[in-house]
Structure formats: structure tokens, C-alpha cells
A protein has these predicted regions:
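ATP-dependent adenylate-handling ligase core
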Residues: 1-11, 44
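Glycine-rich phosphate-binding loop signature in dinucleotide/nucleotide-binding domains
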Residues: 12-19
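Flexible helical/loop "lid" subdomain adjacent to adenine-nucleotide binding pockets
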Residues: 20, 26, 31-166
Length: 166
């Protein structure tokens, strides 16, 4: 569903000659995402949460409010006299995100808060970036082109950590 929504927004933006879309996700959304991914036993990619910036469907996407709480953003919008639209599905208990939101309230006394989960996602995103950099450097030294294909010495590949192999 998320991919379909992004594709629809991208189609609309391209018809309007818009190249950049800003999304209103907040630290609360990030924490909910991390919690949902934790429930799925996600690896590093899932636990980094939502990306802040990326390019897809010919559009540059950004989430500049990932550092702000949902209520902080709403307070700012109120002070500016700006309205927003809440998706009614955000109150539907059938959806995992709504369940995660409610679970976060229950986990808060344990110190598992929006702020801590968002900070953890940020730390893991930095770790993912470091891993990507290391893999890129390793690929530069190990990968050779042969007969139009790319090869890596099998024995060397087998001795790499699984995250490096992926």
C-alpha cells in the first residue's frame, strides 16, 4: 500500500512539474516504524526506520520532521495558523501502526519512548551507512569484471560476515 501511495503522489507531482515532495512523518512515526519492524525481527535495514531523504519514481522525497514529536509539529502548525489532515485510518485498531502507537504508551514507563526509539534508529542508520561504505570499499578491491560479468573470489566471499555478503 505504501509503494502504491508513493507512486500515486509521484505521478501527481510529475504532472505538476514538481520534483521534490516533503512528507510530514515525525519522530512518533519513526518510533512506531521501529517498533513494528522489531516485532517482525527485522535486521539492520528495518531497525533504521524511515529514511530522511531518498530518490524514487523520479522524485526527491524528504522527511524533515523526523526529529520532532507529532504534538510539537501540530503545535507549530497551530501557531502558524496552518491546518493539517489526519488520516482516519490512524485511529483504526486493525492496523499495526495504531497497535504500535498504543504499545508505545504502555512501554514508556520502561524507558522505551518515542525519543529513545528514534535515537536508536538514527544510531543504526549511521551503522548502516558505515557498513555500506565498508562494503563499497571491499567491492572496489575484490570485484573484477570478466567476460562482461562481475566476479568475486569464492573463498574470500565465504569468509565475509553475512551482513557484508548481503
Amino acid at each position: 500500500a505504501r509503494r502504491a501511495r508513493l507512486a500515486l503522489m509521484a505521478d501527481w507531482a510529475q504532472r505538476k512539474d514538481i520534483s521534490h515532495i516533503v512528507l510530514g512523518h515525525t519522530a512518533d512515526d519513526q518510533a512506531e516504524t521501529v517498533l513494528m519492524n522489531l516485532a517482525r525481527a527485522a535486521g539492520l535495514d528495518g531497525l533504521t526506520g524511515m529514511r530522511g531523504n531518498w530518490d524514487e519514481h523520479g522524485i526527491h522525497w524528504s522527511r524533515p520532521f523526523l526529529h520532532m514529536g507529532r504534538e510539537d509539529l501540530r503545535g507549530y502548525l497551530r501557531r502558524q495558523g496552518l491546518a493539517w489532515i489526519d488520516d482516519p485510518s490512524n485511529e483504526n485498531d486493525r492496523f499495526s501502526r495504531v497497535k504500535a502507537r498504543k504499545a508505545l504508551r504502555a512501554l514508556s514507563p520502561l524507558g522505551i519512548t518515542v525519543e529513545r526509539l528514534s535515537e536508536t534508529a538514527s544510531h543504526l542508520a549511521s551503522a548502516r551507512q558505515a557498513l555500506n561504505h565498508a562494503v563499497s570499499n571491499l567491492a572496489d578491491t575484490l570485484v573484477t569484471e570478466r567476460a562482461g560479468g562481475l566476479t568475486v573470489p569464492r573463498q574470500t566471499f565465504r569468509h565475509l560476515m553475512p551482513d557484508m555478503q548481503r
